[in-house]
Amino acid sequence: MEVFLGILIPFLGTAAGAACVFFMKSSLGDLVQRSLAGFAAGVMVAASIWSLLIPAIEQSAALGKLSFFPAFAGFWLGVLFLLTLDRMIPHLHIGSEQAEGPKSDLSRTAMMVLAVTLHNIPEGMAVGVMYAGFLSGSPQITAASALALSLGIAIQNFPEGAIISMPLRAEGENRGRAFLGGVLSGAVEPIGAVLTILAAQLIIPALPYLLSFAAGAMLYVVVEELIPEMSQGRHSNIGTVFFAAGFSVMMALDVALG
């Protein structure tokens, strides 16, 4: 039950954020979107460092001077994995007019949902690999540290849910469909978490690689999507401030609960 709830918490954060479409009448302003993107980026960077990369290196201590290698290799595999998905799947980032990936007849709404879904894949993997480490008895990963990551992802998923549902509403979708789009974008997280747990249980020695793989995938999303989004326009400083806030919140959660 503990693991089930931990996997579900980030998804609930997305759903709660998507529900904002029922209570807010206007679309999110540029200032708000940049603030939310900065906060999400800060949480993801802190989670990648404190919850994923450092435990990956600690678990490889027996390799001596090569203890960095699993984290190094897994990190690059994660980056390349997201780069490949980015090129293979048609998607449209919020606020952009030009779709990325192969040409497609998909609607703008569908491609916007796909963009956020791509973003959520590494987050689900990160939660899954943390709980896999806990279930395997890894001394570097406790139930509390896994919960800290789950809560941190849920916190940054709340604004993400709003970031997808509100623009969908602005695109002309009714509130119900806009909410559903936000919820569906987060559904990949518990699925990814469960698949990652199953994979890790089969190959426990690969846990350091899986931890750093999730970190690489998350940081790819931060650099490719969130940093440009939070830095646009004359309000760019607000994105930086909220990045620092998100980083601080996730760091505090990891240290306090881990």
Give the role of each language-model region.
Residues 1-258:
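Intrinsically disordered, metal-sensing/regulatory segments
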